[in-house]
């Protein structure tokens, strides 16, 4: 898989009909994700001003806003410094990796923010309706990631990538 391939339904939000199990709609946040910056955490459902929204945030630190009735992209916000996407289309929500990430191969060392620990990770977000506040735990660190050969054997698993934490710009030495 490359960053140019979709790998359908990975890093996606899916709405399933509970009676039939059929997919009602889906939105793929990051097609071809390759840096372990997946969008796999909670979906927060918010009703406000007569609208029904779905918010989610993943390891890339991008907060997504979708129409929860249709799955249509509404908006996104970068909540922390990120430099893995050279294109962040505010109209369509389409992201494009930097060229050096798209070209990286086994043995290539890539600098990336945030790290694979994630801008957001397993600590759940929460919505406070009285305050109108969405509270999101964030992690601010960057990484160097080097791809290594992987021997595919039954029961093996893992990517075998080597990664090192590094300081995120603007964090004043705090990792």
Describe these PLM feature segments.
Residues 1-2, 12, 37-58, 121-126, ...:
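Repeat-blade elements of multi-bladed beta-propeller folds
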Residues 2-39, 46-51, 62-112, 142-175:
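Extracytoplasmic/lumenal domain signature
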Residues 93, 100, 108-111, 117-143:
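Long, low-complexity segments enriched in small/aliphatic residues
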């Amino acid at each position: 898989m490359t960053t140019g391939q979709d790998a359908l339904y990975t890093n996606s939000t899916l709405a399933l009909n509970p009676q039939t199990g059929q997919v009602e709609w889906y939105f793929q946040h990051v097609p071809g994700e390759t840096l372990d910056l997946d969008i796999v955490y909670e979906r927060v459902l918010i009703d406000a001003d007569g609208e029904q929204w779905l918010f989610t945030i993943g390891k890339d630190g991008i907060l997504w806003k979708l129409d929860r009735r249709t799955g249509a992209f509404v908006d996104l916000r970068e909540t922390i410094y990120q430099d893995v996407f050279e294109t962040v289309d505010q109209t369509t929500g389409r992201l494009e990796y930097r060229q050096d990430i798209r070209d990286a191969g086994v043995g290539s060392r890539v600098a990336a923010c945030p790290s694979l620990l994630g801008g957001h990770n397993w600590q759940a977000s929460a919505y406070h309706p009285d305050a109108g506040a969405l509270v999101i735990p964030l992690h601010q660190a960057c990484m160097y990631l080097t791809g290594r050969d992987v021997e595919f054997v039954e029961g093996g698993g893992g990517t075998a990538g080597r990664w090192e934490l590094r300081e995120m710009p603007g964090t004043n030495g705090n990792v």
